[in-house]
């Protein structure tokens, strides 16, 4: 495993780990969910997430402390924010206690990938959920999937935080009273044009 031997070489990117958590919402209820080794998602070409961007996500990290413990910081707050995000996009909230348990299960199943203390690297944890059944015509999906994967990453700002060159434009990422206050995939897609344009200039 590269993190154990060369943590300084890991960037902020995706490296597959052993297991991820998956739960499904169908017929008005979430199932118990569980861990799987399969990193792939199979869905219909007309899935709600593909047609109408009905997806929300969170992000957090697990890291090794100086005394060798593996910890995360306040996953309960991420659980609450995902509930708020889901409600805003008319998605069934994933229960907060099950959210935290899914994080714990995923980290434990991939603890070999948590970088050692002092490397500056961490295990990035990505919980997300999305509408998975076919939807044509603008309306909420009826079936959903909640997933958590983890991947070892180096510092987001490699080499530390440095002064930035700013680019000011009249581009709006989110409209007033819209979805700017939640972690929805559509908000981040809206920022891509501004990011690419800024780097190009």
Residue ranges and their predicted role:
Residues 4-109, 135-201:
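Helix-start/capping segments and mature chain N-termini
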Residues 95-97, 113-122:
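Flexible, glycine/charged-enriched surface loops at secondary-structure junctions
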Residues 104, 118, 124-133, 137-140:
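Active-site periphery "cap/insert" segments of enzyme catalytic domains
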């Amino acid at each position: 495993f590269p993190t154990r031997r060369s943590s300084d070489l890991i960037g902020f990117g995706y490296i597959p780990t052993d297991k991820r958590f998956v739960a499904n919402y169908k017929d008005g209820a979430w199932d118990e969910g569980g861990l799987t080794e399969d990193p792939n998602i199979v869905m219909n070409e007309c899935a709600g997430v593909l047609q109408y961007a009905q997806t929300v996500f969170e992000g957090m990290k697990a890291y090794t402390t100086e005394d060798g413990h593996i910890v995360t910081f306040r996953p309960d707050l991420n659980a609450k924010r995902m509930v708020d995000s889901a409600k805003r996009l008319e998605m069934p909230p994933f229960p907060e206690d099950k959210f935290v348990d899914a994080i714990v299960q995923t980290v434990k199943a991939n603890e070999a990938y948590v970088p050692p203390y002092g490397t500056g690297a961490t295990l990035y944890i990505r919980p997300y959920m999305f509408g998975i059944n076919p939807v044509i015509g603008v309306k909420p999906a009826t079936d959903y999937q909640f997933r958590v994967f983890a991947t070892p990453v180096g510092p987001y700002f490699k080499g530390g935080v440095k002064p930035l060159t700013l680019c000011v434009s009249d581009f709006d990422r989110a409209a007033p009273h819209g979805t700017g206050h939640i972690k929805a995939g559509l908000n981040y897609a809206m920022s891509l044009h501004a990011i690419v344009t800024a780097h190009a200039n």
